[in-house]
Structure formats: C-alpha cells, structure tokens
C-alpha cells in the first residue's frame, strides 16, 4: 500500500491509497475517517474505490493524481 495524498482537518482525515489487490493488480482507494467529539478518531474508515485492476502501479498513481484534483487535494 502506498499513500499518495493525505489531508487532515477539524472534521477528520482523508487520503488516497494505491493498494495491491489479491490478483496482484493495483486499486486506487479514497478513504475518510472522522474525528469523534472527544477529539479521538472513530474506528470506521470509509472506503470508495476510484479505480481498480490496474496492471501498472504507474497507471494507478496517475488515476490517484487525477482523483486528487477532483477531490480538492
């Protein structure tokens, strides 16, 4: 797994990872995790698949870069 983009705010944190799947291909995942009222992090991490099945890590990274622009990183 390789974190391509990361951002933290008052609400929580969000990031885009490039992960290797069980088939040895690369997937691009957008993840978010909210802060709890006590300032800690909620255990749940939401995951949205932005792209999957890339044979090349470079192609997955290009997808992550495009997505980062769309998500305002």
Question: How would you name each of these model-derived features?
Answer:
Residues 67-73:
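Short arginine-rich
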Residues 1-38:
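Short N-terminal "domain-start" leader segments
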Residues 2-6, 33-35, 41-59:
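A short, exposed loop/beta-hairpin motif centered on an aromatic-Gly-Thr core
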Residues 16, 28, 43-44, 55-57, ...:
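Intrinsically disordered, low-complexity, compositionally biased regions/tails
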């Amino acid at each position: 797994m390789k974190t391509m983009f990361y951002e933290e705010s008052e609400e929580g944190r969000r990031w885009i990872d490039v992960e290797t799947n069980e088939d040895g291909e690369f997937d691009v995942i957008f993840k978010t995790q909210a802060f709890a009222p006590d300032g800690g992090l909620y255990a749940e991490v939401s995951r949205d698949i932005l792209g999957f099945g890339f044979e090349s890590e470079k192609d997955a990274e290009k997808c992550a870069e495009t997505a980062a622009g769309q998500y305002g990183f």
